[in-house]
């Protein structure tokens, strides 16, 4: 069969883009060679509807072992009693939890998208906001942090069946203990989406939500540095609180409802090649070197945030506790949108993403800010001594976002700098 040169040429172009640039998108990372090998393996050929030992297809003996290893490793990593590693993405994992916990029209709470939440936490254009009744909570305008007193007041008023914590653009630690107290007070379940800080949590550098939440979801490809995918965890299994029963009249465990919500609820056959790659990544995360890597991720982020503030940029909440930060452009460049900033920086081979900031007057297509993070550049071996220089390069571009000569000059410096770093150094 003839090799598809069109696609493989594009793959090489993407490889070169990744090698030459400074990758600052907070949700992106670079995986190891062995994770990619597992993902591109013959495991992709196997259909395996169901779960290990309970499949609807024959010949699943090997993929059963691979999936069970992934389950065992992720449980060990977070101290969980139960895990499902089949969700194709974090959004699919969240969709499955909502399907298991809510009926159509039920009320739940999540962080508003404009304040750093995620589409799957109740956005009206997402199934979570179409099928159910979302109530959004906000950040404090003064501090840029979650206002737990306001969250509690809203929970008492709206009586949600489920409260969701976690977000896609929130740089601070979450108070899981307080959130569990709020959930218990109103009789709600607590779900934490730890997709962004999952790697830092696995390394013990941030609080583990598995100790407090009824259910925890995550992606596997951000700070956890695995293939693109999702997981669902529970610290401890429990009887479902709605009295749903098995055909034999026994109260169903929450794990049974969640398993059924993933398959056949929102998915068919699992991606066993991706699950194999997840298992490899989870094994890497159990190695002591992973904590060293995550420590550097956090250190780089703290220094990067301070460098932005030293240059006169507003960092929402005044800093970061994790790998990410949200930059509000309005105080320094009132007329500059996140869209224009992103385009100019990408042209200089510095990749960021435009992002709404709390109480933003601009739309999600324009925005008044952008989001940055350090997982990917840290994987390449970049240390904190380069953070000030990176902000200097960004500032030069944003000070003249339409000046092609400035952009070309910065791009040359970026390419020269990144030529010293491999794609995967840890």
UniProtKB/Swiss-Prot annotation:
Mostly located where? cytoplasm
Subcellular locations according to the entry: Cytoplasm
Pathway where this protein functions? One-carbon metabolism; tetrahydrofolate interconversion; Amino-acid biosynthesis; glycine biosynthesis; glycine from L-serine: step 1/1
Tell me where the transmembrane regions lie: none
Q: Which GO terms describe its biological process?
A: glycine biosynthetic process from serine; tetrahydrofolate interconversion
Q: What Enzyme Commission number does this protein have?
A: 2.1.2.1
The catalytic activity, as recorded, is:
(6R)-5,10-methylene-5,6,7,8-tetrahydrofolate + glycine + H2O = (6S)-5,6,7,8-tetrahydrofolate + L-serine
Residues that bind (6S)-5,6,7,8-tetrahydrofolate: 113, 117-119, 363-365
Recorded GO cellular component terms are: cytosol
Q: Which cofactor does it need?
A: pyridoxal 5'-phosphate
Alphabetically ordered keywords of this record: Amino-acid biosynthesis, Cytoplasm, One-carbon metabolism, Pyridoxal phosphate, Transferase
Q: Which Gene3D superfamilies match?
A: Aspartate Aminotransferase, domain 1, Type I PLP-dependent aspartate aminotransferase-like (Major domain)
Q: Name one Pfam family in it.
A: SHMT
Q: Which residues are annotated as site, described as Plays an important role in substrate specificity?
A: 221
Q: Which residues carry this modification: N6-(pyridoxal phosphate)lysine?
A: 222
Q: Name one GO molecular function term.
A: pyridoxal phosphate binding
Family note: Belongs to the SHMT family.
Q: How does it assemble?
A: Homodimer.
Please name the NCBIfam families in this protein's record: PRK00011.1
- Protein function: Catalyzes the reversible interconversion of serine and glycine with tetrahydrofolate (THF) serving as the one-carbon carrier. This reaction serves as the major source of one-carbon groups required for the biosynthesis of purines, thymidylate, methionine, and other important biomolecules. Also exhibits THF-independent aldolase activity toward beta-hydroxyamino acids, producing glycine and aldehydes, via a retro-aldol mechanism.
- Protein name (Swiss-Prot/TrEMBL): Serine hydroxymethyltransferase
């Amino acid at each position: 069969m003839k090799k598809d040169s069109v696609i493989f040429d594009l793959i090489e172009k993407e490889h070169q883009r990744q090698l030459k640039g400074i990758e600052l998108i907070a949700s992106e990372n670079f995986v190891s060679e062995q994770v990619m090998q597992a993902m591109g393996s013959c495991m992709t050929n196997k259909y395996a509807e169901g779960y290990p030992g309970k499949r609807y297809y024959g010949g699943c003996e090997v993929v059963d072992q691979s999936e069970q290893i992934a389950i065992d490793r992720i449980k060990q990593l977070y101290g969980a009693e139960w895990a499902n590693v089949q969700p194709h993405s974090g959004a699919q994992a969240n969709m499955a939890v909502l399907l298991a916990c809510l009926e159509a029209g039920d009320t739940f709470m999540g962080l508003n998208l404009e304040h750093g939440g995620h589409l799957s936490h109740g956005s009206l254009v997402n199934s979570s906001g179409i099928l159910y009744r979302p109530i959004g909570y906000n950040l404090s305008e003064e501090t840029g942090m979650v206002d737990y007193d306001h969250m509690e007041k809203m929970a008492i008023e709206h009586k949600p069946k489920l409260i969701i914590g976690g977000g896609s653009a929130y740089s601070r630690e979450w108070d899981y203990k307080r959130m569990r107290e709020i959930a218990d007070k109103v009789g709600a379940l607590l779900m934490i989406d730890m997709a962004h800080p999952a790697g830092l949590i696995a390394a013990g550098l941030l609080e583990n939500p598995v100790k407090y939440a009824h259910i925890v979801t995550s992606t596997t490809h951000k700070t956890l540095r695995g293939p693109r995918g999702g997981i669902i965890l529970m610290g401890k299994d429990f009887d479902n609180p709605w009295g749903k029963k098995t055909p034999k009249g026994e109260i169903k465990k929450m794990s049974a409802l969640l398993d059924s919500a993933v398959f056949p609820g929102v998915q068919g056959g699992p991606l066993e090649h991706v699950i194999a790659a997840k298992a490899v990544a989870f094994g890497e995360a159990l190695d002591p070197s992973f904590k060293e890597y995550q420590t550097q991720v956090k250190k780089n982020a703290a220094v990067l945030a301070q460098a932005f503030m030293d240059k006169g940029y507003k960092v929402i909440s005044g800093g970061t506790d994790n790998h990410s930060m949200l930059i509000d452009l309005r105080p320094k460049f009132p007329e500059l949108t996140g869209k224009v900033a992103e385009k100019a920086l990408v042209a200089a081979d510095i990749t960021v993403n435009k992002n709404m900031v709390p109480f933003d007057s601009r739309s999600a297509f324009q925005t008044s800010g952008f989001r940055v993070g350090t997982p990917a550049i840290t994987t390449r071996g970049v240390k904190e001594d380069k953070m000030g220089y990176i902000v200097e390069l960004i500032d030069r571009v944003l000070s003249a976002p339409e000046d092609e000569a400035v952009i070309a000059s910065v791009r040359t410096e970026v390419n020269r700098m990144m030529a010293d770093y491999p794609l995967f150094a840890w």
